Structure formats: structure tokens, C-alpha cells
Amino acid sequence: MDKKKLLYWVGGGLVLILIWLWFRNRPAAQVASNWEGPPYMTYNQPQAGSVTLPVAGYTSPSPTLPNRNRSCGCNPAVSAAMAQGADLASKLTDSITSQLNDYASSLNDYLASQAGV
């Protein structure tokens, strides 16, 4: 085996090792296909009107009962957390807006005093 062939084998092996190291530490949700749906649908607790499959963390909708929790794309805990987050975001936005308005008015006053208006 000449040097060129040996170099190709070593380089290919290093590439395979790098690929293995890259995927070894990644969470399964990033590697696996997204067949369970978005992440907020993959909670481990079974939801009302669903059949628990032997796949960890996946519940399929029952063919007979309507699954009201899954039809909106989220469970009640996630809905409550999203509402709380939206409330906090609106409060934060209001606070930042008022602070920026105060800063802008004080800056206008300062600039007007400097200009002698």
C-alpha cells in the first residue's frame, strides 16, 4: 500500500470518528426524525382520551374519544406556562417602553437646554 492510499484510509477514518463524536453527545430529539410532532407534544404523561403506546413518551390519539388536549397542540400545563410567559412579556415590554419614553423626554429636555431654546 503506497503512501497516498494510506493517507486516504487514515483521513477517511478520522472523518468517521469526527462524525461519530459529533452525534454521540447530541440529544436524541435532535438526531431522530420529528415523527412525534413538535417538542411540546412529547410529554411523558398520558393525556385524556389517548392510548399509551409502548414507545416512551408518545401517546397516540384514541380512535374513539376526541383528544381535546392534543387537538390544540399543547397540554394544559404548557398552555398555562405560555399564558404566564405572554403576561410577563407584555409587562416587560410596557416597562421598557416607559423607560425609553422617560429617557427620550429627558434627552429632549437636555438637548433643548443646551441649544438655548
Curated annotation (Swiss-Prot):
It is a single-pass membrane protein. GO terms for cellular component: membrane; viral inner membrane; virion membrane. The chain crosses the membrane at residues 7-24. It is found in: Virion membrane. The keyword S-adenosyl-L-methionine does not apply. It comes from the Viruses. Keywords: Capsid inner membrane protein, Membrane, Transmembrane, Transmembrane helix, Virion. Its main location: virion. Protein of the infection vertex complex, which increases the vertex stability. Anchors the vertex structure to the viral membrane. Essential for viral infectivity. This is Protein P16. The lineage of its organism: Viruses, Varidnaviria, Bamfordvirae, Preplasmiviricota, Tectiliviricetes. The gene is XVI.
